[in-house]
From Swiss-Prot:
Species, as recorded: Chromohalobacter salexigens (strain ATCC BAA-138 / DSM 3043 / CIP 106854 / NCIMB 13768 / 1H11)
Keyword Ribonucleoprotein: no
Gene Ontology terms, MF aspect: oxidoreductase activity, acting on NAD(P)H, quinone or similar compound as acceptor
NCBIfam families: nqrA, PRK05352.1-2
Classification of source organism: Bacteria, Pseudomonadati, Pseudomonadota, Gammaproteobacteria, Oceanospirillales
InterPro entries named in the record: NqrA, NQRA_2nd, NqrA_C_domain, NQRA_N
Protein name: Na(+)-translocating NADH-quinone reductase subunit A
Oligomeric form and interacting partners: Composed of six subunits; NqrA, NqrB, NqrC, NqrD, NqrE and NqrF.
Keyword set, alphabetical order: Ion transport, NAD, Sodium, Sodium transport, Translocase, Transport, Ubiquinone
Assigned protein family: Belongs to the NqrA family.
PANTHER family: NA(+)-TRANSLOCATING NADH-QUINONE REDUCTASE SUBUNIT A (PTHR37839:SF1)
C-alpha cells in the first residue's frame, strides 16, 4: 500500500450519494475534438449524414490508423469548429431505435488465447482504442506501439467523485474480461490502482498487479501511480485508461457490442440531488441535467472535476470523453465590497488565512471567482504542501513558465499531465493556470526531442 501524505481533499458541499440511478434519456451526444491532444481529423461524414453506433466518423492525420466512431446512432446535426478549423465537436441527434455496428464476439474462454494484433484491430475498428492514452504526452497511442506497462485507474479522489468500487460491483465479470484483453497488449504488467480496502476483481489474473493507494488527492491520479510504480521517460512509455473503459473492453470482446453506458457523479453546491447517474458517452449536459440544477441561470456546469474540468457550454455542452462527473458551482460574477478585508467566515484557504478554519467548518460552497487577478509567482511553500511526487514543484513551475524545456525535463515534467498540476493552480497566490503552461512545454518537447 502506498500512502499519499501531501495533497488536498477540498471540503466542498454537495457530495453525491453513492447509489446509481438511471438518468433521463438524452437526445444528443457528441465527440469532443478537444479531448484528444494534438488530434487532427480527416472527416468521413458530413452534417445530415445518418450513422450507426460504432460507425466511423473521422480518423487522425497525426496517428495513422486511429479511428473515432459514433457514440450513438442517428443524424450528424453539427460539426463545430473553432479557430484555425480546430474540431470542437461532432454532434449526433439520436434515433428512437438505434442501429449498431456489430463486432466479433470471442466469448469468455477465448480471451486468454487472443492474438495481440487481433485485439488491436478490434479495438481500433470499434473506436475503443481512443480510450487509451500515453504517458508522457497524454496522446492516443499508435496502433503499432507497445507500452512498457498499462495502468488502470480504479480509484477517484477528485472532489465530489463516484466510488469506482460501486460501479465495478455491477460488472465484475466484464471488468475481469477487460483486464485479460489489456494483458494481450503489453509484455509488462497491467497495474490496477485502487483505494485501500476496496475489493476490485482480477487480482488472481496472471500479469495483473493490484496496487492500493491511500491518502489525499492526488492519490487517485494516474500520474501519481506511474511516478511510484513505473516512471516514464522519452524512451519509455506506458499507457493508461479508466476503469469503466476496461468494462467496455470486456463487453466488446465477449459480447461483440460497443457499450457506451457510463456512470457519472453529479454534485456540487448547486446540485438538487447529488448522486450517481447512469448515462452514456458524450451525453448532452443540458438534457441530462434538466431539473437537476438549483438556479440554473446562475450556475456553471463543469464536465469533470473542479480542479481539472471543462466548462460545458456552447459546442462543448457534453460529457467529456475522459470525465466521470458533472460539477455544479455558482458563477463568481458578483464582487464583494472590500472583499480583501473579509474575515472569510465561509471561505476556504490552504494557507489558513481565514477565520473559517477556527470555526470547524467541514464543507464550503465556493463560486467560480479567482478572488483576484494574475500577479507574480510567489514561492511561499504552497506548492510543496500539495505535491506528493518526488519533484521540486516551485523550481519546476518556474521553468515551465519561462519555457525552459531542458530544465523542465530534468525536473520531471514528462511524468505529468494537466491534472497533475491542478492543485498547484488551486493554491497558487499568483493565479497561474499551470495546466495549459505544462501542455505548451510538452508540445515543444515532443517537437524538438
Amino acid at each position: 500500500m502506498i500512502e499519499v501524505k501531501r495533497g488536498l481533499d477540498l471540503p466542498i458541499a454537495g457530495s453525491p450519494e453513492q447509489r446509481i440511478d438511471d438518468a433521463s434519456p438524452v437526445r444528443h451526444v457528441a465527440i469532443l475534438g478537444t479531448d484528444y491532444v494534438g488530434m487532427k481529423p480527416t472527416m468521413e461524414v458530413r452534417e445530415g449524414d445518418k450513422v450507426k453506433l460504432g460507425q466511423l466518423l473521422f480518423t487522425d492525420k497525426k496517428v495513422p490508423g486511429v479511428r473515432f466512431t459514433a457514440p450513438g446512432a442517428g443524424e450528424v446535426v453539427a460539426i463545430n469548429r473553432g479557430e484555425k478549423r480546430r474540431l470542437l465537436s461532432v454532434v449526433i441527434k439520436l434515433d428512437d431505435n438505434e442501429e449498431a455496428v456489430s463486432f466479433t464476439a470471442h466469448g469468455e474462454q477465448a480471451l486468454d488465447g487472443l492474438d495481440r494484433q487481433a485485439v488491436v484491430d478490434q479495438l481500433v475498428d470499434s473506436g475503443l482504442w481512443t480510450a487509451l492514452r500515453t504517458r508522457p504526452f497524454s496522446r492516443t497511442p499508435a496502433p503499432d506501439a507497445v507500452p512498457a506497462d498499462i495502468f488502470v485507474t480504479a480509484i477517484d479522489t477528485h472532489p465530489l467523485s463516484a466510488d469506482p468500487s460501486v460501479v465495478i460491483e455491477e460488472d465484475k465479470a466484464a471488468f475481469e474480461h477487460g483486464l485479460k484483453v489489456l494483458k494481450r497488449l503489453t509484455p509488462g504488467k497491467v497495474f490496477v490502482c485502487h483505494q485501500q480496502g476496496a475489493e476490485i476483481p482480477g487480482s488472481q489474473l496472471e500479469g495483473v498487479q493490484h496496487e492500493a493507494f491511500a491518502g489525499r488527492h492526488p492519490a487517485g491520479l494516474v500520474g501519481t501511480h506511474i511516478h511510484f510504480l513505473s516512471p516514464v521517460s522519452l524512451g519509455r512509455k506506458v499507457w493508461h485508461l479508466d476503469y469503466q473503459d476496461v468494462i467496455a473492453f470486456g463487453k466488446l470482446f465477449v459480447e461483440g457490442r460497443l457499450d457506451t453506458r457510463r456512470v457519472i457523479a453529479v454534485g456540487g453546491p448547486r446540485a438538487k440531488h447529488p448522486r450517481l447517474l447512469r448515462t452514456r458517452l458524450g451525453a448532452s449536459s443540458s438534457e441530462l441535467l434538466d431539473g437537476e440544477i438549483e438556479a440554473p441561470d446562475d450556475t456553471r456546469v463543469i464536465s469533470g472535476s473542479v480542479f481539472g474540468g471543462e466548462i460545458a457550454e456552447g459546442s462543448r455542452r457534453f460529457l467529456g470523453r475522459f470525465h466521470r462527473q458533472f460539477t455544479l458551482l455558482e458563477e463568481g460574477n458578483k464582487r464583494a465590497f472590500l472583499g480583501w478585508l473579509s474575515p472569510g467566515l465561509r471561505r476556504h484557504s490552504v494557507m489558513g488565512i481565514y477565520v473559517s478554519q477556527f470555526l470547524g467548518l467541514n464543507q464550503y460552497a465556493p463560486n467560480t471567482s479567482t478572488n483576484g487577478s494574475e500577479r507574480a509567482m510567489v514561492p511561499v511553500g504552497a506548492y510543496e504542501r500539495v505535491m506528493p511526487l518526488d519533484i521540486m514543484p516551485t523550481q519546476l513551475l518556474r521553468s515551465l513558465i519561462v519555457g525552459d524545456i531542458e530544465t523542465s525535463m530534468q525536473l520531471g515534467c514528462l511524468e505529468l499531465d494537466e491534472e497533475d498540476l491542478a492543485l498547484c493552480t488551486y493554491v497558487c497566490p499568483g493565479k497561474y493556470e499551470y495546466g495549459p503552461i505544462l501542455r505548451d512545454n510538452l508540445t515543444m518537447i515532443e517537437k524538438e526531442a
